[in-house]
Regions:
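Cell wall/extracellular polymer interaction/catalysis modules
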Residues: 1-27
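Exported/periplasmic cell-wall-interacting domains
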Residues: 22-29, 34-134
Length: 134
């Protein structure tokens, strides 16, 4: 969900980090660090082109995922991302147009999750909080 001045701007199903592979998304309170159009997101074994990228915790951010046909429910448990928040392309465009740098991001899991992957440990809420003072 994205609320501005108490009103719902947009909502959508998402796909967060794949917890079965230890790539859970960081949970905590963050802010949009910057916005970038036409980015290539690069990891150890992938490179994904996205139209709209809005990072909030180091290299973890909200972006379109044109390669996905479904979003929401429990996809993240077995077919999630490398940690980013995947949203449908039309919703990513709407968010990109309406979010401002500095907009708060509240990320959480509904059930307890143990994050174990090295890249998740590096990008977790504690390290981000320590560096940014959030």
């Amino acid at each position: 969900w994205y609320y501005k001045d108490g009103s719902l701007v947009t909502d959508t199903g998402i796909v967060s980090g794949n917890i079965s592979r230890g790539n859970g998304s960081p949970d905590g309170i963050f802010k949009i660090a910057y916005k970038q159009k036409d980015a290539t997101l690069v990891g150890e074994n992938y490179a994904s082109d996205v139209r709209y990228f809005m990072p909030f915790a180091y290299n973890v951010g909200i972006h379109d995922a044109s390669w996905r046909s479904t979003f929401g429910k429990e996809i993240y448990k077995t077919s999630g991302s490398h940690g980013c928040i995947n949203v449908p392309p039309k919703k990513a465009k709407k968010l990109f147009q309406t979010l401002q740098v500095g907009t708060p991001v509240i990320a959480y899991y509904r059930e307890p999750v143990t994050l174990t992957a090295e890249n998740t440990r590096i990008s977790n809420a504690y390290s981000y909080k320590a560096e940014t003072g959030l």
